[in-house]
Amino acid sequence: MKKIMALILVFALAATMCACDGLEKLEQVELPPLPTVEPSQEPETTPEPEESPEPSPEPAELGNRVIVSIKNNTEIHNAPDNEAQRILTFSYDTPQVHIEGNDAAAAVINDHIALLDELYYTGTGEGGGVNAMLEMALDNYSYFVDTGAEIGLEFSSDRTVKISRADSSVISLVFTTMTYTGGAHGNYFDKGYVYDAQTGELLTLDKLTSDYDAFSGFVQEYMLTLAKEDETYASLELIEDLPSALSALLREGSWYFDENGLVLFSDVYELASYAEGIIRFTIPYTELENVIDEKWLPDERQGGDGSFEVSLQSDVPSGSVEIIDKVTADSEGLELCLKAVGTVYDVSISSVEYADYSHKFFETASHWACSYMNDCAIQLVTLIPEGMPDLMISYTTADGTRQHILISQSGEDGSIIIIDAESVEAVG
């Protein structure tokens, strides 16, 4: 027993010595200071993490502002022996493109438009040209003088331009040429020209995609489906080989982009009668994703809905709003300030007429288009008729809604007002 107790004492002594040695080493280690807590201070508790709200999307970059203004050029020719008798009206619209921050691309486009003007005026392109038209008009008038026949004496050639899309990616123009040289009705045709807004290059169908065969097949199939399922194209059932007739529309000059999508169209008489006119097929942009290159699709838009307000220019203090352009619809009219409140897209200004049979306005002339306006204004010179308004401003809001408004005058106090085109009805 004594031996056992002795052994226990030996082990205990050894453990004590080891512990002392360990304590000496621990004492040499510097420990961080403990936090001091006041007696009255409650310990801080870590709050439960709150769900952070989804970050608001950044507004989409607006890109370079694109403005297209249209100037009309008109020549009037009268009979050589009767200044009161008009025998020819020869006119054409000239679009002028301005791209903020990219004068080089705008110059390329404007040079091509100048070439189109020259071809139309001289008659070396499609159309007779002013000299050929005047010669025909003089021959027609001479026949009338010699025979006294009851014939139409006024010939005409008119080329108008519709701005179907203008943004930082694409500038798309549709030229409509109408000629009348006697007979029951005149003749007309459309021609589409689409430009790359970054370079000014005139686009062709094969430049829309890296896989033209797949693109071509998709477009033909889409048109064929529309023709079979949409009642708008019911008359096309009479065409014997409809697939071949539709595939022929995949050609240069017979397509353009507008706010809705890719449009392909026929010539008059090609698919239907003169009364039915030009047949158009629209393929929405949503259907063109992964079919054409993404850069040709419209940019995604974000932000609140914008709107317009109008006032007399004389009532607007100088320097109170940024004026980006001046648009003259009628040089003898009032000078107005048309201001965008917030951001609006695809702004266009056009002359219109009201059709009683459809209870809608249809465009008679394009004046101006702009890719976007944000808290800025234009000076607008226009007449305001006493009756039905004849000038329409169209624009798209951030959510994609297309709006059409008219400028009119209040019957109560004579102030300049904006009215919704959808709310207008003819009286009487």
Q: What are the language-model segments listed below?
A:
Residues E201-A234, K339-N374:
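The feature marks short-to-medium sequence segments in extracytoplasmic or secretory-pathway proteins
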Residues P35-P57:
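Extracellular mucin-like PTS domains
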